[in-house]
Swiss-Prot record:
Photosystem II (PSII) is a light-driven water:plastoquinone oxidoreductase that uses light energy to abstract electrons from H(2)O, generating O(2) and a proton gradient subsequently used for ATP formation. It consists of a core antenna complex that captures photons, and an electron transfer chain that converts photonic excitation into a charge separation. The D1/D2 (PsbA/PsbD) reaction center heterodimer binds P680, the primary electron donor of PSII as well as several subsequent electron acceptors. Belongs to the reaction center PufL/M/PsbA/D family. It holds the Pfam family Photo_RC. It comes from the Eukaryota. This is Photosystem II protein D1. Chlorophyll a ChlzD1 binds at H118. Fe cation binds at H215, H272. NCBIfam families: psbA. A quinone binds at H215, S264, F265. GO terms for biological process: photosynthetic electron transport in photosystem II; response to herbicide. Its main location: plastid. The lineage of its organism: Eukaryota, Glaucocystophyceae, Cyanophoraceae, Cyanophora. The gene is psbA. The record marks H190 as: Stabilizes free radical intermediate.
Length: 360
């Protein structure tokens, strides 16, 4: 009997680390993008929670009138927010070491920049990690491509818009009511509801919701029953089974008769491509619209566009919207300036459509 002895090939610590990072056998895939993603998102989340709970007021407008956003200073979950960096900081990079003290850094809204920068890099790495895992598993890369839509939207409101407006103080606050305030001010200053790219985003989000509900309900309604009436139809499905789980012919026939024949997909691949494409393209265009409005290429303006033969303005719905925009604009940053730019420059603009009659 002959025994063969073979020395095990030694694997360096670095090779073991690389194998662990890139292994698809882990319960949670890490990947090289994950090496950056996990610490970035954990750091952003940690400081967001601390700032949301305990950050002192921030001089957002740069006029020595701090605005409180944390729970410790009287806010609740709805009204609380991480307040954007001060207008006195502008677009300057403002890490902790650039401030004279921690108190100054907090007063000027340093945590906002900290959270936003780490968050944007973190979600970008998450997108890269999606691609990396798809690559390791031999899948196509469209999951990461779809995720690029919300990444683009977040980048637009947290980075591109402040760059275009010249200050991080114009970025979206990190809170519920702060988000709504950002939306109202954005409408007032850029007329976003009249921008075609925003309209495409609305069609993408609401259309995507409609198509998702239609698809899910059609599939659920055309499941191939493998069980008796006394047990759930779900019990007839086995993970990884070769047989189809629903009858696409039945779903196609139902929907084709409900609307018309060519409104229904007869190809599962083209159907799911459409379901992915519609909302993604819509949100891409919304992000693109936000990025153009950041540099004041605003929504369509039809104010005072209808006049009579004497040149007098005939008010339209566009003029009603314009009046609402002016009202929203004069309410925000009320102490930073006496009048909004639309009222402080140019010719006098009437804010009432018709003058009230006195003693009539």
């Amino acid at each position: 009997m002959t025994a063969t002895l073979e020395r095990n090939a030694s694997v360096s610590l670095w090779e073991q680390f690389c194998g662990f990072i890139t292994s698809t056998e882990n319960r949670l895939y890490i990947g090289w993008f994950g090496v950056l993603m996990f610490p970035l998102l954990l750091t952003a989340t940690t400081l967001f929670i601390i700032a949301f709970v305990a950050a002192p007021p921030v001089d957002i407008d740069g006029i020595r009138e701090p605005v409180a956003g944390s729970l410790f200073y009287g806010n609740n979950i709805i009204s609380g927010a991480v307040i954007p960096s001060s207008a006195a900081i502008g677009m300057h990079f403002y890490p902790i070491w650039e401030a004279a003290s921690l108190d100054e850094w907090l007063y000027n809204g340093g945590p906002y920049q900290f959270v936003v920068m780490h968050f944007l890099l973190g979600v970008a790495c998450y997108m890269g990690r999606e691609w990396e895992l798809s690559f390791r598993l031999g899948m196509r890369p469209w999951i990461a491509v779809a995720y690029s839509a919300p990444v683009a939207a977040a980048t637009a409101v947290f980075l591109i818009y402040p760059i275009g407006q010249g200050s991080f103080s114009d970025g979206m606050p990190l809170g519920i009511s702060g988000t709504f305030n950002f939306m109202l001010v954005f409408q007032a200053e850029h007329n976003i509801l009249m921008h075609p790219f925003h309209m495409m985003g609305v069609a993408g989000v609401f259309g995507g919701s409609l198509f998702s509900a239609m698809h899910g309900s059609l599939v659920t309604s055309s499941l191939i029953r493998e069980t008796t009436e006394n047990e759930s139809a779900n019990a007839g499905y086995k993970f990884g089974q070769e047989e189809e789980t629903y009858n696409i012919v039945a779903a196609h026939g139902y929907f084709g008769r409900l609307i018309f024949q060519y409104a229904s997909f007869n190809n599962s691949r083209s159907l799911h491509f459409f379901l992915a494409l519609w909302p993604v393209v819509g949100i891409w265009f919304t992000a693109l619209g936000l990025s153009t409005m950041a540099f004041n290429l605003n929504g369509l303006n039809f104010n005072q566009s209808v006049v009579d033969s004497q040149g007098r303005v005939i008010s339209t719905w566009a003029d009603i919207i314009n009046r609402a925009n002016l009202g929203m604009e004069v309410m925000h940053e009320r102490n930073a300036h006496n009048f909004p730019l639309d009222l402080a420059s140019g010719e006098v603009m009437p804010v009432a459509l018709t003058a009230p009659s006195i003693n009539a």
